[in-house]
Amino acid sequence: MSLNIPPKPEESLWTDDQWKAIQAKGNNVLVAAAAGSGKTAVLVTRIIEKLIDESANLNVDELLIVTFTNASAAEMKFRIGKGLEEALGQNPDSAHLKRQVALLNYASISTLHSFCLEIIRKYYFEADIDPSFRLIEPIESSMIRDEVLEGLLEQEYGIENNEAFFHLVESFTGDRSDAELHSLISKLYDFSRANPDPNAWLEAMVNFYNTEEITSITELPYFPIIKEDIELRVNQAKNYLLNAINYANENNGPAPYLATLENDLVQIQALSELNWSSWTHLKTSIENIDFKRIPTLKNKSDYDEVYVEEAKKFRDAAKKEMKNIATDWFSREEVNCLSDLEKMKPDIQTLSELVKKFSANFFEEKQQRGVLDFNDLEHLALKILLNDDKASEVAQNYQKQFKEVLIDEYQDTNMVQETILRLVTNPSEAQGNLFMVGDVKQSIYRFRLAEPTLFMTKYQTFQQDGSGNGIRIDLSQNFRSRKEVLDATNFIFRQLMDKHIAEIDYDTAAELTLGANFPETNAMETELLLIDMKTEDTETEDELSPQELQKNQVESRAIAMKIREMIDNKFPIYDKKLKQNRPIQYRDIIILSRAMTSAPDMEEAMKVQDIPFYANNNSGYFETTEVATMIALMKVVDNPYQDIPLAAVLRSPIIGLNEEELGQIRMAKKKGYFYDALLTYKDITVSETANKISDFVQQLNNWRELSIRENLTSLIWQIYQETNFYEFVGGLPGGKQRQANLRALYDRANQYEKTSFRGLFRFVRFVERLEIRGDDLGTAKTLGEKEDVVRMMTIHASKGLEFPVVIVSGLSRKFNMRDIYSKTLLDKDYGFASSYRDVEKMIVYPTIMQQAIKQKKSREMIAEEMRVLYVALTRAEEKLILVATVPDFEKTSKNWLQVAKEKETILPAATRAKAKCYLDWIGNATIRHPAFKELLCEEIIQTLATEMKLQIEIKTKEMFLTNELERAESDNWLENIKEHQPVPIQSPYKDEIQRYMEYEYQNEAATEIRAKQSVTELKRQFSLQDSWSDTTLLKEFQKVSLDRPKFLQKNKLSATEIGTAMHTLMQAVSLDYKPTKEDLEQLLHTMREKDILTDVQIKAINIKQILDFFESPLGETMLQKKDLVKREVPFSYLLPVSELYEKVDLDERVLIQGVVDSMIEEEETITLIDYKTDKIEGRYADWNAAEKVMKERYHIQIKLYAEAIQAISGKKVAAAYLYFFDGQHICQINTKEGL
C-alpha cells in the first residue's frame, strides 16, 4: 500500500524518517526509535499536527495516549498543551483549537494502569465490584496476600485424607517449614497474572507433564531448546579444537599433536550430521566420542612451551564441553526422563489448583475490604472489555471513540496489556489505528514480565513500504551524543547483538548515526580503565582469600580520583544553552551501576576526594542507626518482654546506659526476661542508674497507654518530643539526612494507618516482614534535582535520561543467576519446571524439562543483560568512561585473545552466550580494537575497521589502596618538625591521660587468655611460636575469620572453603557400601538441590580423592565398622590454663571447643580420624619431609581432641590418625606427648 506521506517542507528540521513517523497513517505503525533519536518529540509533534489540522476533524479526547510512567504522561500532556497554545496564538479565532485546549484535561493521556482504572470506575457494574473501592499500595497488598495464603495453607492442612496436598508439601518443601511452598504459590500467582487468562495458563502448565502419548524426548514441545543448546556447545567444542590445531601448526608448535587433534575434530564435525529425530541415536553419538591420549613430546626443548600449553588447554576445553553435554542431557535414560514428568503430574495438578484457590480467596478478601491492587486493574479492565473471547460492547464503544491509539515504550508491554490495547483499537488490519514507539534494544524490564517478542514480531512483519501487516519506520539518528560515544557503542554492539543471542540483529538499521552537532574537542575518546587485582595465591587450608569487598573499594577510589582530576583540570563540557564550552561541574557526571551494592564504598571514596555525592539508593533505611533505634523502641512499647530491642533502647542515646550498667541490671535477676531484671534492679537499688531506669519505666508505661488511646503517628511524634531524639540526631554527622529519615518514619506510619491495617503491633510486624523479605524503603531523599553533586544510580533508573559524562562501574560484577539456578523455574511458554523428588527414596533428579527451561531462561537473561549494557552506554552525551577490576590482567587478556583471530565481525555465539559479566563482552569486543593491539603488541589480533577512539589504562590495585591525601594529612606533624615549627602537645588532660597510660593491671596475663577458644585457634597460636622457645603467650589474638557467605564464594574458593566442602561431603557419604563415582555424583546433586553445597563448591570437590579414601585402610575400616562410626562429633571441654601456657600461673580454666571429623567408638576404645586437604604433592620433596611438617602442625589439635574425647567418654583413645586427601597419606599422631 502507498504511505501517502505529504512532502516535507524545505525549512523543516525533521529528518526524512522522523517526518515519515509524524505523517504516516492508514495502518498500524511501529516506530523503532534508537536511543537519543527524538522519539518523544516525534510523538508529541504527530499528536499536535493531527489536532491542529481542522480538516482531520479530530478531538484530543478521541486519542488514547499510553506512556510508561506517570511522569512521562504529565510531560506529554504539558508538551501537547504548549503546542496547542502556540498554535492558538497564531490562529486566535480558531474555535477548533480552543476546543482542544478545553478538552485536554479530559483526554486519555496516562499509563495503561490509569486507563484501566478509568474503565473500572466507569463500568464497575460490568465487573461486579463495589464502586467505592480504594486502590491500595503494593505493601498493603502483600500484607493481605500473606494473611490469605497462610489461611489457605492452614485450611488445607486441616482437611482429612488430603493426600494430594501432603504429597505436594513433601515434594516441594524442606523439613522445617512450608515457606518454600508459600513462596512458590506466590510466585506462580504473580507469573500467571502476566497472561490474559491466568487460570488457562495454570491449566496449560499441567499439560506439559502429560507424556503418556510421547515416545521420545524429541517429541517434547521444548525439544528445540535442547537441540539449540547441544548445537551451540558442539560448535564451541569444534572452535576449541580449531584453536588447538592452529597452535599445533605454528612454527615450533606441537606438531605431533596434529593427528590426534584432527581425529578429535572429525568426530566433532560428524555430529553436525546427527539424526535429531532419535534421542537414543543422539545419546549414543555423544557418548561414543573417544578422545585418544595425546602423544608425549620427545625433545620438549624443540617446541614453544606457550604453544604446547595453549594447544593442550584448548583440547581440554573441548573435552570438557563434550563431557558437560553428556552430563547435562544424557545422564539418565530416555524412558526415565519421560516417566519423571508423568510422575510429577499429580503434584503439578495440585499446585495449579492451589494457586487458583489462592487467587480466588485473595480477590474475595480484597472485595470484602473494599480495596483493589494494581494487578487487579488490568485484569478487571480485561474482564469488562472481553465477552466470550470477543470485544464486548464496552470495547466496541472505545474502538469507535479512539481515532488513534498511541503507545510509548512499546517494547516493555506484556501480554495482558497487548490484549487490552488490541481490544480498544480498530480491529481491521487494513485500517489499523495503532501507533507504537519503542526500541527493543532498550527492553530491560523482563523481570516485570515485559515481553519484547511482541515488538520483535511486529518489527519482522511490518514493512517500511507498508506492504506487510503494518508500517515500520526506523529512527537511527542520535541527537544526544558525540560521535565518540556513538562510535564506541556501535563498535561494541556490532560484535555482540544478533537475533540468535540478543533477540535482535544490530544491523545498519539498528546502528546509531550522528545527528547532533558538537564543537571539536580533544579528550572525548572513550576510556577503558582496568584495575589489575592480582594477588599471591594462598594454598594452606586455614588461610582465607582476600575479601570481595576490596574490589568495590579500589574501583570506587579509582573513579573518585578520575572525577577529581577532571574537575581540577576543568574538563570542557559543551553547554547547549550557552552554545559554548564551559568547565565541567559535579552535576555533569553520573556513575551508573547494575546494582547499588558499591554505593557505601563510592560515598567514602568521594568524601576523601572532597566531592559532593548522592547515591539514589533504595536500601539501607532500616539499617540507619536512628531508624533502627526507633523501631527497637516501638517494639519495646508494643511488648517490653523482648530482650534485644530493650537492650538496644537502653544502650541508645535515648536512655544512655553503658555496658557496665547493663551488666549490673542483668545481675539483679540472672534468669528470665531482661525487663524483669530491669524492674528488680529499679526496686532494690539506689543509684543514678536506678533513677534513669525509673524515669524510663514511667515514660514507657505512658507510651504504652498512648499507643492504645491514640494513633501511631501521635505516638511517634510524642516520642520525638519527649526524648529530644529528633534534635539529638540533627547534631550528629549527617544530621540533615538522619532527621529526614525520622520524618520519613513518621510519614510512613501515617501512610500505614490509611490502610486496612491498624495499631502498633501490626505496624511492628509489618516492618519485620519488610526486613525479612529485603523490601527496604530506601533512605529519605534530601537533595533536589538541581544540586551540584555527582550522582550514582542504577542503569535501570537512568533509562530515558542523559548526562554529559557517564562512568559505567562494576563491569566485572557477575550477572545475577539466582533465578536460573532456582529450584523452581517459571516460563511464559512452558509453565513450571523443577527437579523430580522421589519422596520414598529421598533422591532428587533434574528433569529434562528443568534443564531445557534453565537454558531458555539463561539465553533470555543474557539477551536482557546485553540490552541493559546498551542502555548504560547510550546515556552519555559527550564522554564515556568504562571502569572494571580484573583478577589478573595477564590471564584475562589471554582469554580475550582467544577471539582475536576471528575474522567475522560478530563474536562467536558461545563466547557471547557464556559471558558472566559485562566485561566479558567489552573485553572480547575491544581486544580487536587497534588500541589493544598496540598495548599488547600481539600480532595475532585481527583488528576491526573502526573510527572509535579508545584510550585504555591498566592500573594496579596498589595505586588506590593508600590515599595520598590521607597520608599527607597524617604526616603534617613531621613536616612541622622538619621546619622547626612547634608541635602542640600540651593539654589540660595530659596528667589524666598519663595516669591511664601508666596504669598496670596486676593480673595482666589473664587478659591475654580467652575464656573460650577453638582447637583450631589454639593450633594456629602454637604453630606461630618459635620451635626452640618455651611455650609463651601470644600478645595478640588471631583475627576472627568468618566464613564467606555462599554468594561471595566466587569461581575460585579459598583453601578453607574447599576443605569445608570436602568435609561436608564426607559427613554425608553413606557407609552402607563402598561408594562409586555415580553414587557421589548423585549425592552431590541432591546436596545442591537442598542448598547444602553450591555449584562452585561442588566443582571444587575432588571426587577421586573421596573414592581413594574408601580404598585406604582407614576407609575400609570405617565401612567394616559402620555401626560404630560417629561423624562430625562436637565437644566442649574445660582445660586448666597452666596445661596450655606453662608460664602462666593462674587458677583459671579455658573452655576448649572443637569438632572431631570421625571416630570409631568400640566397647573400650576409640579411634580418631581427622581429614586434611592440605596440598602435599609437589610442595614437599617426599612424604617423609611432608609428614614431619604435618605432625608439627596438627599435633596440638589432635592431642586436645584425644584428651577431650577421653575425658568426656571415659574410654581410652587407642589411636588417632590424620588422612591427607592429596596423595592418600595416613599419619598417626602420638597423643601421649605433651603440648
UniProtKB/Swiss-Prot annotation:
Q: Which reaction does it catalyse?
A: Couples ATP hydrolysis with the unwinding of duplex DNA by translocating in the 3'-5' direction; ATP + H2O = ADP + phosphate + H(+)
Q: Which GO terms describe its cellular component?
A: cytosol; DNA helicase complex
State the Gene Ontology terms under molecular function. Answer: 3'-5' DNA helicase activity; 3'-5' exonuclease activity; ATP binding; ATP hydrolysis activity; double-stranded DNA binding
UniProt-listed Enzyme Commission number(s): 3.1.-.-, 5.6.2.4
Name the keywords, alphabetized: ATP-binding, DNA damage, DNA repair, DNA-binding, Exonuclease, Helicase, Hydrolase, Isomerase, Nuclease, Nucleotide-binding
Residues engaged in binding ATP: A33, A34, A35, G36, S37, G38, K39, T40
Stretches of the chain forming a coiled coil according to its record: none
One GO BP annotation is:
double-strand break repair via homologous recombination
Q: Which Pfam families match?
A: PDDEXK_1, UvrD-helicase, UvrD_C
Q: In this protein, which residues make up the domain named UvrD-like helicase C-terminal? A: 509-800
Its required cofactor(s), as named, are: Mg(2+)
Indicate the segments forming the UvrD-like helicase ATP-binding domain, all copies: 12-482
- Mark the transmembrane ranges: none
- In the UniProt record, the signal sequence range is none
NCBIfam families for this protein: addA_Gpos
Do you know which PANTHER family this protein is assigned to? ATP-DEPENDENT HELICASE_NUCLEASE SUBUNIT A, UVRD / RECB / PCRA DNA HELICASE FAMILY MEMBER
The Swiss-Prot or TrEMBL record describes its family as follows:
Belongs to the helicase family. AddA subfamily.
This chain's function reads:
The heterodimer acts as both an ATP-dependent DNA helicase and an ATP-dependent, dual-direction single-stranded exonuclease. Recognizes the chi site generating a DNA molecule suitable for the initiation of homologous recombination. The AddA nuclease domain is required for chi fragment generation; this subunit has the helicase and 3' -> 5' nuclease activities.
Q: How does it assemble?
A: Heterodimer of AddA and AddB/RexB.
What is the protein name given in its UniProt record?
Answer: ATP-dependent helicase/nuclease subunit A
What does UniProt list as this organism's lineage?
Bacteria, Bacillati, Bacillota, Bacilli, Bacillales
Name of the encoding gene: addA
